[in-house]
Amino acid sequence: DRYYRWSNANIHRGVHVLAEEATMLYEDARRNVAGFIGARDAREIIFTRNTTEAINLVAYSWGRANLQAGDVIILTEMEHHSNLVPWQMLAQERQVRLEFIPVTDDGLLDMEEYQKLLMLAPKLVAFTQMSNVLGTINPAGEIIRLAHDAGAITLVDGAQSVPHIPVN
């Protein structure tokens, strides 16, 4: 309510008082989010409208610039469509190969199979930290460490986890 009454202006676009106030509030929010999730620098925070838009942004910017035919992306079988469809579209466009970490009967990721998939030298491992369907909390630290050891970068869909568990 306060913003709409007293600071309603475009951010980063004006030198008048309302624009400067709106920009200050926006950048304060960026710093608050960075602190909340343990980011090293507030400049690491990019605001998007939602998870789908954020992952599409990565897929169509980083993905198009860095992936080519035959490259491998590892996902999990428990992904929400926001972390599945962009990679499927990119795979079709670029002839990139998608591989999936299976889910065990008790709703956990099969980490032994994950380690086998890493032998395919993936460029990217993209996974949900907390499944919105199963409620499973995946071992993000271990998944990331193993991916980095294999030379892959990681994308963590933290939309479900950030409000519920500490992240960094």
Feature roles, as predicted:
Residues D1-N168:
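Pyridoxal 5′-phosphate
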